[in-house]
Amino acid sequence: MANTTGRIPLWLIGTVAGILVLGLLGIFFYGSYSGLGSSL
């Protein structure tokens, strides 16, 4: 896991991507339940 070739670590990309996906899903579910996400 110490092979740093100047690129962004995969675990960091996975963590950020997971947080973004969970955030988007939360926004979509909240919008659909509150009636604001029908246009999305």
Swiss-Prot record:
One GO cellular component, as annotated: chloroplast thylakoid membrane
Lipid bilayer topology: Single-pass membrane protein
Keyword Membrane: yes
Parts of the chain that traverse the membrane: 8-28
Chief localisation class: plastid
UniProt keyword list: Chloroplast, Membrane, Photosynthesis, Photosystem II, Plastid, Reaction center, Thylakoid, Transmembrane, Transmembrane helix
Any one Gene Ontology BP term: photosynthesis
Places the protein is found: Plastid, Chloroplast thylakoid membrane
InterPro entries (alphabetical): PSII_PsbJ (IPR002682), PSII_PsbJ_sf (IPR037267)
Function (record text): One of the components of the core complex of photosystem II (PSII). PSII is a light-driven water:plastoquinone oxidoreductase that uses light energy to abstract electrons from H(2)O, generating O(2) and a proton gradient subsequently used for ATP formation. It consists of a core antenna complex that captures photons, and an electron transfer chain that converts photonic excitation into a charge separation.
Family label: Belongs to the PsbJ family.
Assembly, per entry: PSII is composed of 1 copy each of membrane proteins PsbA, PsbB, PsbC, PsbD, PsbE, PsbF, PsbH, PsbI, PsbJ, PsbK, PsbL, PsbM, PsbT, PsbX, PsbY, PsbZ, Psb30/Ycf12, at least 3 peripheral proteins of the oxygen-evolving complex and a large number of cofactors. It forms dimeric complexes.
Protein name as it appears in the record: Photosystem II reaction center protein J
Organism: Physcomitrium patens
